[in-house]
């Protein structure tokens, strides 16, 4: 029982809380990390009318381990939370749920701002304090909320064959308005068909954003953003200005021509001002705006770069006193009824860091190459001496070889920026409507009488605004470098959508790459919102017959699908669910999953699939030559049938989670039927592959997807290991096999082979790229070598995250943490120890908090330290061949049971089993 006495005094209130339990929440404990949806903190312009709430406890000084109940209050005012929560009071709900708790109150409407707080009860029914107050402000949730019109420069009026200048020359737009009253609040709701910058009274509202609103299936949905501009509006004349460019909407996409995407960019904005007397004012895009294409940005392309002519600058063009009499009128376009306008589902791409050059080399009197030491994505900012009329050119490269600038792997992407100075002196320039993947920048055309210096240039690192955890470290410097490279690959390719690469004439959201990297990225960064938004786009692009494009958003370039790629419809939602425990991702995706199964079925005969496939993409040492070599040696039908079975299995699991039991029964029958057909079609009685070549990936698919009878699992494992050993313990896997390799070998009891593969120095291996100077993960296992130079194939990205899939095993293998239940409600902790690694440490993010694991090799074994967060139950499982000789809790008290470990810190001492004679 807890006794609380409250004494009121004139000056202050003192609350004494006395707990009779030794296992209770202490007075200062209260929920923290209040978030809504997929991780938004106090969002402005939120997208979900019925939000989901999440929180974590702050119980570092208490002995509580579990939540038994919670209470959420939501009100239209902060004060209302204390007296009358007018939107929702859940009252006390008996539940351990701390994440994705569904709002069940009164309707929340567009623009509305609500305030919320939460408290919880621990396992002894002791209540925490109330959390601090958090808030949510909605964006415009429905198309009907928009009173604005789409506008663009008159000269860009749609035609059947617009010129390149029509599409690629940015449009400058502006309007003026007066404010006569005191402003209480002002919100700017804005978007574009294309990309935009917005200015209010000369202030760049989007200064930290890059290429908003981002890339969605434009015919289905365009995302909108909300900005608080209250402090920028003056009680007099005001001006609202914008620049729009094609971005991903019009002009060049991938290696297609401008005319393949010939709809010119358009702009939509709605400024809503609330005065202190609670009256309102709307300023919208309409036919009164003015426009010009005679601004200084003369050309802009995501792929080809930007051309800036200083002689066209229009000083003060977004200020209210600017003379726009020579500007033209705008045209207005009707809204497309089928296109949804919805608030952005994840944070935009932003400028997140700056890099300075490590070194530079002058290669001619007016040309210098700067080396930033890191392959990255973004744009440069230059500040350097120039001569009037002498063009400054900036070229980009991911690598040099013997001093030569390497751009062959950009293929047809020019990726070049140009700056034309209007006068002698020091010029400053940062590209606005493009982005580049690069480590090196070549600048030519500067004032050759001046000697280059490092501070002429900085690199602006851009990526989707995500939190990176930097949550793994080991005793092996190359393993740490590999983690760092994968981390940079994540940053560079998470550019509003998950790009395959950030530098060449492609930069698309390939689904197969996403399958390989979704789980690793969830361990490495706060990317749930990013992935759920991408998955939403995938569902929108899926056709009625279940067809899923190779890349999302889809552009008409490669108009077929592939097994192992389109299966993102089932793989992505299930991986997200296991990592988060958020059932909504399954609810939203289940119809799409079923539809994809139907499409798979349409491509199969007698349960053997003939679906097109890219195969085990970029498998090393293929037998085929030419372009066919890229697809690897594993039989295509084997691959497609295996992924058919995998998608059925995941859809069955989803049906069970959602309570669709009849569906689950039907899918269970189908799964077993496919497994039998797979076994009979592709293997003989001795489990030798009889269609196509016997490959590591053939056995990996069979084992990872449970397609063999239990009695044959050991046989398949033995054959896989034999193939590895015959390759001198080198992998022979591409995009489909590599993600499965480590886990299958661990399941076979051969983590020694995983470590051998991981630490392999020669081609093909992860350390091979590091030994050859990589600072990000490569597309190919042999993209470059110091001796031979670059792979001759043009498709040779040096920043490709797919092979970063191995980082999943850093968390699930080296640290040994896996979810036993969705959202890590129950977790297995079984670090895979090895004498090849002196120590390893890291944290595994869960909705309830981090699971921390560290281990260190000792003279006779290993010491393992584990921290289990509040509300999670964990089981410690010694790895194969090891025994626990001592286990203690944070008080150094011995513990005898390692199953059902509650929140707290634990230490384990392990030794190698004597019969095994030594550590692996």
UniProtKB/Swiss-Prot annotation:
Pfam families: Bac_rhamnosid, Bac_rhamnosid6H, Bac_rhamnosid_C, Bac_rhamnosid_N. Alpha-L-rhamnose binds at residues 500, 504-506, 513, 565, 800. It catalyses: Hydrolysis of terminal non-reducing alpha-L-rhamnose residues in alpha-L-rhamnosides. Transmembrane segments: none annotated. The active site is at residues 506, 779. InterPro entries: 6-hairpin_glycosidase_sf (IPR008928), 6hp_glycosidase-like_sf (IPR012341), Alpha_rhamnosid (IPR016007), Bac_rhamnosid6H (IPR035396), Bac_rhamnosid_C (IPR035398), Bac_rhamnosid_N (IPR013737), Ig-like_fold (IPR013783), Rhamnosid_concanavalin (IPR008902). Its EC number is 3.2.1.40. It comes from the Bacteria. A lipid is attached at residue 20 (S-diacylglycerol cysteine). Belongs to the glycosyl hydrolase 78 family. This is Alpha-L-rhamnosidase.
């Amino acid at each position: 029982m807890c006794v609380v006495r409250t004494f009121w005094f004139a000056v202050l209130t003192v609350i004494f809380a006395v707990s009779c339990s030794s296992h209770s929440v202490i007075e200062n404990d209260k929920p923290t990390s209040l978030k809504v949806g997929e991780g938004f903190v106090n969002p402005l312009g939120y997208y979900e009318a019925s939000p989901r709430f999440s929180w974590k406890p702050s119980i570092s000084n208490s002995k509580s381990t579990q939540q038994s109940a919670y209470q959420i209050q939501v009100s239209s005012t902060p004060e209302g939370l204390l007296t009358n929560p007018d939107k929702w009071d859940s009252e006390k709900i008996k539940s351990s749920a701390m994440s994705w708790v569904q709002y069940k109150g009164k309707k929340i409407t567009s623009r509305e701002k609500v305030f919320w707080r939460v408290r919880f009860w621990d396992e002894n029914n002791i209540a925490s304090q109330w959390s601090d107050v958090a808030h949510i402000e909605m964006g415009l949730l429905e198309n009907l909320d928009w009173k604005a019109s789409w506008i663009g420069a008159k000269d860009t009026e749609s035609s059947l064959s617009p010129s390149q200048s029509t599409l690629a020359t940015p449009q400058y737009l502006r309007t003026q308005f007066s404010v006569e009253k005191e402003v209480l609040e002002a919100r700017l709701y804005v978007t574009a068909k294309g990309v935009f910058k917005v200015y209010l009274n000369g202030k760049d509202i989007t200064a930290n954003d890059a290429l908003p609103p981002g890339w969605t299936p434009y015919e289905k949905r365009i995302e909108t953003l909300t900005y608080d501009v209250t402090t920028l509006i003056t009680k007099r004349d005001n001006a609202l200005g914008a620049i729009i460019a094609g971005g991903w909407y019009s002009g060049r996409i991938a290696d297609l021509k401008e005319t393949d995407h010939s709809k010119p960019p358009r702009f939509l904005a709605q400024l809503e001002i609330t005065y202190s007397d609670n009256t309102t004012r709307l300023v919208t895009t309409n036919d009164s705006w003015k426009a010009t294409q005679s601004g200084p940005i003369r050309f802009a392309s995501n792929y080809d770069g930007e051309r800036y002519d200083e002689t066209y600058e229009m000083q003060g063009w977004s200020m209210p006193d600017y003379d726009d009499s020579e500007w033209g009128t705008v045209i207005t376009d009707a809204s497309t009824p089928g296109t949804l306008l919805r608030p952005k589902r994840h944070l935009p791409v932003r400028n997140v860091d700056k890099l300075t050059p490590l070194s530079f080399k002058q290669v001619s009197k007016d040309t210098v190459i700067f080396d930033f030491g890191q392959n990255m994505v973004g744009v440069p900012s230059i500040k350097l001496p120039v001569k009037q009329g002498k063009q400054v050119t900036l070229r980009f490269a991911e690598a040099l070889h013997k001093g030569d600038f390497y751009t062959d792997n950009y293929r047809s992407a020019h990726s070049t920026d140009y700056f034309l100075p209007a006068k002698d002196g020091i010029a400053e320039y940062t590209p606005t409507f493009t982005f580049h993947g690069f480590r090196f920048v070549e600048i030519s055309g500067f004032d050759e009488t001046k000697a280059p210096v490092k501070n002429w240039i900085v690199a602006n690192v851009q990526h989707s605004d995500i939190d990176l955890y930097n949550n793994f470290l080991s005793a092996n410097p190359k393993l740490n470098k590999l983690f760092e490279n994968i981390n940079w690959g994540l940053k560079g390719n998470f550019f509003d959508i998950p790009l395959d690469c950030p530098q060449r004439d492609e930069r698309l959201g390939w689904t197969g790459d996403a399958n390989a990297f979704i789980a690793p990225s969830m361990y490495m960064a706060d990317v749930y919102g990013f992935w759920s938004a991408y998955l939403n786009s995938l569902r929108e692009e899926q056709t009625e017959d279940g067809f899923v494009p190779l890349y999302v958003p889809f552009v008409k370039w490669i108009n077929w699908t592939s097994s192992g790629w389109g299966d993102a419809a089932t793989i992505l939602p299930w991986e997200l669910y296991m990592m988060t425990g958020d059932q909504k991702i399954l609810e939203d995706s289940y119809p799409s999953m079923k539809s994809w199964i139907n499409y798979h079925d349409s491509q199969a005969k007698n349960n053997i699939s003939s679906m097109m496939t890219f195969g085990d993409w970029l498998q090393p040492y293929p037998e085929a030559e030419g372009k066919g070599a890229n697809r690897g040696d594993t039989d295509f039908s084997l691959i497609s049938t295996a992924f058919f079975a995998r998608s059925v299995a995941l859809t069955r699991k989803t049906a069970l989670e959602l309570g669709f039991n009849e569906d689950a029964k039907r899918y269970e029958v189908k799964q077993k039927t496919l497994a039998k057909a797979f076994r009979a079609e592709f293997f003989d009685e001795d489990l030798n592959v009889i269609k196509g070549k016997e490959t590591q990936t053939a056995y990996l698919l069979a084992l990872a997807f449970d397609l063999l009878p239990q009695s044959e699992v050991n046989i398949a494992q033995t054959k896989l290991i034999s193939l590895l050993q015959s390759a001198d313990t080198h992998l022979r896997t591409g995009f489909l096999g590599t993600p499965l390799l480590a886990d299958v070998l661990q399941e076979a009891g051969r983590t020694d082979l995983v470590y051998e593969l991981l630490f392999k120095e020669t081609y093909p291996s992860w350390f091979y790229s590091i030994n050859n100077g990589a600072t990000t993960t490569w597309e190919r296992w042999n993209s470059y070598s110091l001796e031979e130079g670059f792979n001759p194939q043009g498709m040779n990205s040096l920043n490709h995250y797919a092979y970063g899939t191995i980082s999943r095993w850093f968390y699930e293998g080296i640290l040994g943490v896996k979810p036993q239940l969705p959202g890590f409600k129950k977790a297995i902790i079984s670090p895979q120890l090895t004498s090849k690694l002196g120590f390893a440490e890291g944290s595994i993010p869960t909705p309830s908090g981090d699971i921390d694991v560290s281990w260190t090799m000792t003279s006779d074994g290993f010491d393992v330290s584990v921290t289990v967060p509040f509300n999670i139950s964990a089981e410690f499982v010694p790895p194969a061949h090891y025994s626990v000789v001592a286990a203690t809790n944070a008080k150094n008290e011995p513990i005898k049971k390692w199953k059902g470990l509650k929140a707290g810190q634990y230490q384990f001492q392990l030794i190698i089993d004597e019969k095994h004679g030594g550590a692996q």
